[in-house]
Amino acid sequence: MAGTARGCGTSLDLLRSLPRVSLANLKPSPNSRKRERRPRDRRRGRKCGRGHKGERQRGTRPRLGFEGGQTPFYIRIPKYGFNEGHSFRHQYQPLSLRRLQYLIDLGRVDPTQPIDLTQLVNGRGVTIQPLKRDYGVQLVEEGADTFQAKINIEVQLASELAIAAIEKNGGVVTTAFYDPRSLEILCKPIPFFLRGQPIPKRMLPPESLVPYYTDAKNRGYLADPAKFPEARLELAMKFGYVLPDITKDELFRMLSARKDPRQIFFGLAPGWVVNMADKKILKPTDENLLKYYSS
């Protein structure tokens, strides 16, 4: 009897020294948990999420688009070429006259200098991505009533009303084509100059765009310059405004500046190397190089 009392006292002393029993230190009895089955798909288990028997579990469901034997929808309806050649289409980022006037008012675009993609991209006016089939900027007529700047701008496409709004203020518009390599160099000139490579020739437009850029009505850079005065006068008569005489303007030299069809930058000819470290321009002297870059 005394031994039993001594054993109970020892057990109670042991319980007093042990940590208190709580939900945090409870453990299940050994072998009381049933082990979860994990065949193949560990997330689904057992039937792998396919359910019991039938067509869905055995994997014999019909293919996508099968309509039980009748002629499916995608064969009944004829095909139309709405998206034919979509991977080869050129994309042009829109630039409205309202946005252009906003950039000029903020001083992000200088109207006293010829404006091309270099100024527009550096002024954060547009974002051009040649790798995503962007081929430049399309000038749209939004904000034509409030546009007041006198500029010499070069874009890739321009609407008729946008051209009229600029020429009404005594400005000049030129539409020009740039191949992807020339476009990337024009948008990011500093990284190209740091590589120390000669400025390449600008490629001519593809056959499908030749009619557009050789038409004076579109102010194409390949059009006959002698036809421009007639086209400008015709557009002024159509929209009913007096065409200013830019030859008497004090900014005539800036307004008459145009690039050569093979030229990428204003004032820099193909074949020249811009040395950013020494701040010098290196020009080729070899006859073969001069003949190549001038052709």
From Swiss-Prot:
PANTHER family: 50S RIBOSOMAL PROTEIN L15, LARGE RIBOSOMAL SUBUNIT PROTEIN UL15M. Coiled coil: none annotated. This is Large ribosomal subunit protein uL15m. InterPro entries: Ribosomal_uL15, Ribosomal_uL15/eL18, Ribosomal_uL15/eL18_sf, Ribosomal_uL15_bac-type. Transmembrane segments: none annotated. GO terms for molecular function: structural constituent of ribosome. Residues 1-20 form a transit peptide. Belongs to the universal ribosomal protein uL15 family. Gene3D superfamilies: 3.100.10.10. Keywords: Mitochondrion, Ribonucleoprotein, Ribosomal protein, Transit peptide. It is found in: Mitochondrion. GO terms for biological process: cellular response to leukemia inhibitory factor; mitochondrial genome maintenance; mitochondrial translation; translation. Residues 21-67 are annotated as: Disordered. The keyword Lyase does not apply. Component of the mitochondrial ribosome large subunit (39S) which comprises a 16S rRNA and about 50 distinct proteins. Pfam families: Ribosomal_L27A. Residues 32-51 have a biased composition (Basic residues). GO terms for cellular component: mitochondrial inner membrane; mitochondrial large ribosomal subunit; mitochondrion.
